[in-house]
Amino acid sequence: MAMVRLKYCGNRSADDVQVALASGADYLGFIFTESKRNVSPEEVKHWLALASLGDKQLVGVFVNASVDQIASVTEQLPLHVVQCHGHETPAELAVVKEATRLSVWKAIHHDDGALETMKQYAGVADGYVVDSRVAGAWGGTGVSFDWEAVPRYLEEAARQGVPCFIAGGITPDNIERLLAYRPDGIDISSGIETDGRKDPAKMKQIEEKTKQYLAVGKGAK
């Protein structure tokens, strides 16, 4: 049974970072765009200096940012992945990859045309995050999409040879339903928060349910 990778996104304080670093997450995400979870490279650099990164990887999330803006952040922080969460084109992703020499993931917002959109990034995107489409917001909404569509996204990502994370409205209460579809990764922000702060108890619930699922090895067809 393949592992399910966990990404805890939207870390926005020293406490959030310490909690996430102590967790079982594989990736820590930071939002470098207009958002209630927006952070600056300077803040993140300071928080990371207070603790050991260990084997966790860092993801920087950007929305329609210029390559210069992205490169400015990657030069200041030891990011492993750049996540483009807006309307960036395949050509723009290629430029970001060339400039940063990092893995670049593309967010795909679920709708009837999303699968065709995903196919356009084949050979360019190093991974995908499929998120809910919510008017006026790019992500971190706490809203999930119809997970019956998940297998189609996973199949396309597998065809391209890259991982596919699922995001949007995932909580300790519903993660088992999502795990049944065998996603490559799960991207959580609001679902691991209490009163706007990362909650280690919710993280532990997420991790325990994921481990239980992997141990049993069950999944939807």
Curated annotation (Swiss-Prot):
Keywords, sorted A to Z: Amino-acid biosynthesis, Aromatic amino acid biosynthesis, Isomerase, Tryptophan biosynthesis
Functional pathway: Amino-acid biosynthesis; L-tryptophan biosynthesis; L-tryptophan from chorismate: step 3/5
Top EC class, one word: isomerase
Gene field: trpF
GO molecular function (one): phosphoribosylanthranilate isomerase activity
Organism of origin: Geobacillus thermodenitrificans (strain NG80-2)
Disulfide topology: none
Reactions catalysed: N-(5-phospho-beta-D-ribosyl)anthranilate = 1-(2-carboxyphenylamino)-1-deoxy-D-ribulose 5-phosphate
GO BP, one annotated term: L-tryptophan biosynthetic process
NCBIfam families, per the entry: PRK01222.2-1
Protein name: N-(5'-phosphoribosyl)anthranilate isomerase
